Amino acid sequence: MKPIQLENYFEEQNWNWGEYFKFAFVRNPWASCVSKWEYRKRIMNNPTKRQKENGFHDKSKNAIRSWKSFEGMIRQGLAGISTSPQYLWVFGKDSEQLVDFVGKCENLQEDFNIICDKIGIPRQQLPHANKTKHKHYTEYYNDETRQIVAEKYAKDIEYFGYAFGE
């Protein structure tokens, strides 16, 4: 749920939005695209996992099946998968930040610790689930695909301080 939707829900419930600590996590857009590609490969190369993709919409299934290469996925406009820029989940209509803290997946444990400290709960070690082994995300890109992602996610890159290769 987007923060603006939550804010509206709080208002309907007569809860004070300002009394709560709100946070979101974002991910490097280039790394995120590689993750989507690697997920596609796992699904399409594993009949058991392919059976479990029933939760996907038909449009997503068809898009995933149509990708023959990482470059193809990027060039096709990342069609049919969840590709909304992340800033839409963090900022409101007037570019005001709707959450109190934005963590980065690249710093997950450290940023989670900040959240624990802020809300007054003991720090905990997060489990590392769904880890995949693949090359560093920068090795998937050429100049063209790097630029396509940079243009699509320009505001994410700007607002959250991302740069290719960092």
Give, region by region, the residue ranges found by the protein language model.
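Membrane-interface amphipathic segments in extracytoplasmic regions
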Residues: M1-E166
